[in-house]
Amino acid sequence: MTEPLRIVFAGTPEFAAEHLKALLTSPHDVVAVYTQPDRPAGRGQKLMPSPVKQLALEHNIPVLQPPTLRNAEAQAELAALNPDLLVVVAYGLILPQAVLDIPRLGCINSHASLLPRWRGAAPIQRAVEAGDSESGVTVMRMEAGLDTGPMLLKVTTPITAADTGGSLHDRLAELGPPAVIQAIAGLAAGTLEGEVQDDSLATYAHKLNKDEARIDWSRPAVELERLVRAFNPWPICHSTLNGEALKVLAATLAEGAGAPGEIIGASKDGLLVACGEQALCLTRLQLPGGKALNFSDLFNSRREKFALGTVLGVVAQ
C-alpha cells in the first residue's frame, strides 16, 4: 500500500460533502478544506455555512473561504499546505493554472455527468431535461478549461422515467465518492492513465435559471414532463391559475387536446392540461400559502378552482 496522501478538498454543496465524508474515512490526510464564503439563506437571510464547511468543522479540519484563488496571496496560502493532491467537487470557483500546478499529483474533479456530455454547472438537471437514458460521474484530471480534462474513471447509472433532479442527484452523490477514492489510489500508485475527451461530443449544462421554470404550455407535453422532473426540487416548475402562482411538482404524460394551458379534465387522478402537443396530467401541486399536495387532496377541497376551460399561465407567442 502507498503512503497516505496530503489532500486538500475544495467543494461547497451537499453533493461535495458526500465526497468529503468518504475522504475522511480513507487512509489519506485531509489537511484543509476550501469552500465558498457563507451565504444568506432562509427567510431571515442569515449567513449560513456550506454543507462542506459544516462537515469540516465537525472534524476539526481547517476551513478556508477565499472569494477568489486568482491572487498571489491565496495561492501562497494553498502552497503552504504542501498538498499532494487537490480534490475538487462542485466548488464553484474557477481554478487558474497557477493553482492547478501547486499539488504534487495535480488536481482531480468529480463531475456529475458522463463527460464530455454536460460540461458545466447543472449537468444533473440538464440530463433529465434532455431525456437522456443514462447519467453518471466522471472523475477527471483538471486543466484550465471548463470540465475538459482527461477522464480517469466513469461510473454510470440509468435515468428512469420516474427520476427527478433530486433523485438523480442523490444517486450520483452515492456513486461519486467511491470512484474518487479509487482514482486517488490509482494516481498514488502511478497506474491510472487519463482518457482525452472528444470535444466534438461536448455539450454544456448551463446554470439553472428561475425564468426557465415558468411553464410554456405551447411546448410539447413530453418536454414539459421532463422539465417538471428535472427542476424538482429546484427551481420547481410553475404557472398561474386565475392570476395566482401555481407550482407543479409532479406530472405525467397524457392524451388530450385543447388550447395550450387549457384545463380539459379534472379528477382525483390529476389535473389534465392541454399542451402544444398532447397533454400533461398534473398530479402534485402547491398553491400560494399552502404546502405541496397531491391533486386528489386539492380536488376534494378546492374543486371550484379547477373549472374546465380555465387557461393556465401565459402562453408564449
From Swiss-Prot:
It comes from Pseudomonas fluorescens (strain SBW25). Keywords: Protein biosynthesis, Transferase. This is Methionyl-tRNA formyltransferase. Belongs to the Fmt family. It holds the Pfam family Formyl_trans_C. Signal peptide: none annotated. It catalyses: L-methionyl-tRNA(fMet) + (6R)-10-formyltetrahydrofolate = N-formyl-L-methionyl-tRNA(fMet) + (6S)-5,6,7,8-tetrahydrofolate + H(+). GO terms for cellular component: cytosol. Transmembrane segments: none annotated. (6S)-5,6,7,8-tetrahydrofolate binds at residues 113-116. Gene3D superfamilies: Formyl transferase, C-terminal domain, Formyl transferase, N-terminal domain. PROSITE patterns: GART. GO terms for molecular function: methionyl-tRNA formyltransferase activity. InterPro entries: Fmt, Formyl_trans_C, Formyl_trans_C_sf, Formyl_transf_N, Formyl_transf_N_sf, Formyl_transferase-like_C_sf, GART_AS, Met-tRNA-FMT_C.
